[in-house]
Amino acid sequence: MIRLAYRCAVPILAASLVACVPFESLWRKTKPAAKPEAAAVVEPQLPLAEATHRFIVSPEQDVVGRLQVTVSREEDTLADLARRFNVGYTEILRANPGVDPWLPGEGTQIVLPTEFVLPDAAREGLVLNLAAMRIYYYPKREKGAPIEVITHPIGIGKVGWSTPEGSTKVISHVKDPVWTPPVSVRQEHAKDGDILPATVPPGPENPLGRHMMKLAWPSYLIHGTNKPPGVGMRASHGCIRLYPEDISRLYESVPDGTRVTVVNQPYLLGWRGDRLLVQTHEPLEDDKRDWSDVPKNLRQNARRPRTPLWKRIAEHDDAIDWDMVRIAAAEPRGIAFPIGPGTGRDLAATLAEAPRVRNAIPRGATWDGVEDQYAGDPQFAKPDDADETKTSTSP
């Protein structure tokens, strides 16, 4: 049922985003009338969530963040909640099977997948896990200094335009970029009757958003977006998209020359203290690997450990509940839970123990709640109604 719901909801949203169809209804809704103060008594008693994008980790730690649960309001969509809590659309959709993504409804419990198992990759520069649709940034540090990691959701290339795996680097930064659609992209759009211009100037119609980092891979970029609901989806032509508020911070902190490592790891194991956690994501549609027996695949890594993570897993292989891994792989919800050593916890117990938080922008979040990323910039100021009327009637 999880996979069916995901496959039904995502293509509808993706089609609108890829085809550049206006998507105002999802993100910019008419503000509902204010409710009587008495109607909002219960929720403010819940604690405000802490932002889950920046962490300090030890070399032995592989899991950051914490699973949380909130309650939706009548006007919410899952896309609203995803941006509010800095997760991607697919992440929140998979974590909440059976919840209507467009109308979750007043009082519906919403699982916030804000606990993350780090990819098994060198903790250096930018690390992207395509299957999880997440980026991790490890800033340079002095020897002996704590390890910092910053993580955000990303959108990646759609089927047929996959984001490549491997290693590259950031070679330049561009603020308010001009978009020059490649010939291949213009041809694809033309087949659907959508004629793209040769260039798109900076501004609200530019799909690159306000910040762009070029990679050494030709034609591949890390950039913002003018359609935030597409973050956490496969809707690009291979580039990596972030929420405007996230790319603006990475743009300022990631220097040219930063290493970029792209991996594709749908099934993640990681240590938090002396407990091993599993986090499963559905493999990408064009992932050609055989995942019919996930525990077997993972245990092969333990038999030939190449990293400290797998060496430690190999030492505790007999104490790990591999049957629980099989169950998690069969219904991938992106929720991490322990599988040993010792008594593990199933998904239901993990959800029951998750803290309940207020449905509001978390403390320390990257987003301030302003949907228009161009607001306050006179360069992109919108004309007032009088000016618009005058322009439309002029010869």
Question: What label would you give each PLM region?
Answer:
Residues 119-226, 252, 280-281, 286-391:
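Gly/Pro-biased beta-strand-loop elements
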Residues 75, 105-110, 257-260:
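Loop/turn positions that initiate beta-strands
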Residues 251-293:
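N-terminal targeting pre-sequences for secretion and organelle import
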Residues 23, 73-103, 146-148:
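LysM (lysin motif) carbohydrate-binding repeats in extracellular/periplasmic proteins that recognize
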Residues 1-9:
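Bacterial N-terminal signal peptides that target proteins for export
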Residues 18-19:
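C-terminal motif of bacterial Sec signal peptides marking the signal peptidase cleavage site
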Residues 51-86:
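Primarily a LysM-type cell-wall glycan-binding module
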Residues 26-63:
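Post-signal peptide N-terminal segment of mature Sec-exported envelope proteins
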